[in-house]
Amino acid sequence: MIGIDTCFLIDLYWQDSPRNKNARALFSKIVNDDSVQLAIYFNCFNEFLHVITDPKRFENAFSIAEAIDVIDFWCDLDRVKVLYPDDTSFKRTLAWMNMYKLGRNRVNDTQMASCYLSNNITSIITANPKDFEIFHSFELQDYRKKK
């Protein structure tokens, strides 16, 4: 099972993103490989909703309804599992925040990584590998790089 970072969802749907083409190519590859199962940390959807509907960031920002339709689409896919934190992942998040001296801007990514690890997810699709490298727990699939 492969975890998805929020940036992948945003780049997949934001057509003007410089990473859109690579995100779409990777998505097509995933869709065509029935053996690939995906995991999405629940808060990725909250972040997606927050970012993709922001008219200050996007000239053609999604409406709330459009963003929710995208989220519903992902939640309904058979090969996608939405993950939620548990006590272990929450405590690991706090431990990692202390251990790696991470600041407040790293809370969401740290909690996502911890939840993925608790669910035996060892690979993450991201355009921000530096957010996860510090944990030494994941194979990072950086879709910015053409393969």
Regions found by a protein language model. Give the residues of each.
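Acidic, PIN/NYN-like endoribonuclease modules and their adjacent C-terminal/linker elements
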Residues: M1, T110-K147
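Short, well-structured N-terminal submotif of metal-dependent ribonuclease cores
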Residues: M1-I40, P55-D69, K147
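Alpha-helix capping/helix-boundary segments
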Residues: F8, C44, S89, Q111-M112, ...
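Hydrophobic helix-cap positions at the C-terminus of alpha-helices
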Residues: K29-D33, W74, W96, Y100
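Short, conserved active-site loop motifs that form the nucleotide-linked donor/cofactor pocket
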Residues: V36, V80, F138
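Aromatic- and histidine-enriched alpha-helix N-cap/loop-to-helix transition segments
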Residues: I40-N46
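Active-site neighborhoods of divalent-metal-dependent phosphate/nucleic-acid chemistry enzymes
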Residues: V80-S123, A127
